[in-house]
UniProtKB/Swiss-Prot annotation:
Residues 117-331 form the AB hydrolase-1 domain. It comes from Dictyostelium discoideum (Social amoeba). The keyword Hydrolase applies. Keywords: Hydrolase. The lineage of its organism: Eukaryota, Amoebozoa, Evosea, Eumycetozoa, Dictyostelia. This is Abhydrolase domain-containing protein. GO terms for cellular component: phagocytic vesicle. GO terms for molecular function: acetylesterase activity; monoacylglycerol lipase activity. It comes from the Eukaryota. Belongs to the AB hydrolase superfamily. AB hydrolase 4 family. InterPro entries: AB_hydrolase_1 (IPR000073), AB_hydrolase_4_sf (IPR050960), AB_hydrolase_fold (IPR029058), ABHD4 (IPR012020). The keyword Metal-binding does not apply. One of its GO terms (biological process) is medium-chain fatty acid catabolic process. Gene3D superfamilies: alpha/beta hydrolase. The active site is at S200 (charge relay system), D327 (charge relay system), H356 (charge relay system).
Length: 395
């Protein structure tokens, strides 16, 4: 039924000279477990190849037998798992820089204290707080450790109106900076432990924000899931097969077309409506609109600036990356393996299967990546690394 154990091994890339990484992984059983009595986390493997993992890992990840195909995994994760329809409270914000409208959806999962540790969630390309992957993550974070979760909905997404000429992108950081300042100084000023989690495009925004903010960022730790690490490679992969091009490349381009219809005449300076509607791929659309909107000549130039891969070595706060080798949207080609293994603040976790934002486990048909992410963030809850599940929520 299952493939070999070696294929299923969850591979970890990190700087093992940093004792904090070792302490963190010891507390995350869905990320790391001792492989055997002869290999421990303190025994760094002297790898010849940069793409070889840092340590032999006892953790394996298997999807259900019918989700070994990444396309089935993506479809199941997006459309077949039951909807949660979690209750939210919305706050609408207008960025004073240009009048763009964004929103925050607070998941109302229980009664929270004023200082409850809080996760800010960046959704994917054209998503929002309604997405299954967002809601299941927020629910697990609350049930496991009592986290409060707040979703940052981008311009034009999740019902937000278009009130400015600019949209959003991986390099547009004005909105995440505005949201961060509003949450930490106005909405929830008593919260001391802030966390930032990004999915897909949201993880690219997250990494670019981290690189820009440096140590001034109020977020204690971060998680990036299905990050399109090298966007040039992502574009190649989206066009590499008939299925990838049909389902993802054209599908995501059509999502962008629907979103940008809300801009009406605001896009006339970049392209005609006929040109926009004729775009067949994400690269076509980014060449016409996104690149020009954010000051780049071509989509390729935008991808080089937007890719997380260029920033890994410069990240100065803790972050966990989770990606799958079979991800058709965010392939692992072009990953800066050496940078992950030399930066003491980063941990990269790569599974053989999982697709894009899928990671459905055969054990319980729930997201393995959600479990791993919550475990990782939980290690930062207690200053003495002694977490208490009930400290942060009241029933």
């Amino acid at each position: 039924m299952f493939s070999s154990r070696d294929k299923a091994e969850v591979k970890l890339y990190f700087d093992s000279n940093n004792e904090e990484n070792q302490k963190i992984l010891d507390q995350c059983p869905h990320l790391y477990q001792k492989y055997d009595k002869d290999v421990t986390i303190n025994d760094r493997i002297n790898n010849i190849e940069d793409s070889e993992p840092t340590i032999k890992n006892g953790v394996t990840f298997y999807p259900p037998y019918y989700l070994y195909n990444s396309h089935f995994m993506n479809y199941y994760g997006s459309y077949k798992i039951p909807k949660l329809n979690l209750k939210t409270r919305r706050e609408i914000l207008v960025n004073p820089i240009d009048g763009g409208t964004i929103s925050l959806d607070f998941f109302e999962l229980g009664e929270f204290k004023e200082d409850t540790p809080t996760i800010v969630i960046n959704h994917g390309l054209t998503g929002g707080s309604h997405e299954r992957y967002v809601q299941y993550f927020a629910q697990r974070a609350y049930k496991e450790k009592g986290f409060r979760s707040v979703v940052f909905n981008y311009r034009g997404c999740a019902g937000n109106p278009i009130t400015a000429d600019r949209a959003y992108s991986a390099v547009q950081l004005d909105d995440i900076k505005f949201v961060t300042e509003y949450l930490t100084k106005t909405a929830l000023p008593l919260v001391k432990k802030w966390f930032l989690v990004g999915f897909s495009l949201g993880s690219a925004i997250l990494v670019n924000y981290m690189a820009d903010a440096g140590k001034d960022s109020p977020y204690l730790a971060h998680v990036s899931i299905s990050n399109p690490m090298n966007m040039v490679e992502c574009t190649k992969n989206l066009s590499s097969t008939y299925i990838n091009n049909l389902i993802y490349n054209k599908g995501l381009a059509n999502n962008l077309k629907r979103l940008f219809r809300k801009f009406d005449g605001r896009l006339d300076k970049y392209a005609t409506k006929e040109q926009i509607m004729a775009a067949q791929t994400i690269a076509d659309f980014d060449d016409l609109i996104t690149s020009k909107m954010f000051g780049f000549e071509t989509a390729h130039d935008y991808y080089l600036a937007a890719s997380s891969s260029k920033s890994i070595r410069n990240l100065v706060k803790p972050i966990l990356f989770i990606n799958a080798i079979d991800d058709p949207i965010a392939p692992t080609s072009g990953f800066p393996w050496k940078d992950f293994k030399s930066n003491p603040n980063t941990i990269l976790c790569v599974s053989r299967w999982g697709g894009h934002l899928g990671f459905i486990s055969y054990e319980d048909h729930m997201s393995w990546s959600d479990k791993a992410a919550v475990e990782y963030l939980s290690t930062f809850l207690d200053d003495n690394n002694n977490n208490n599940d009930n400290d942060n929520k009241t029933e």
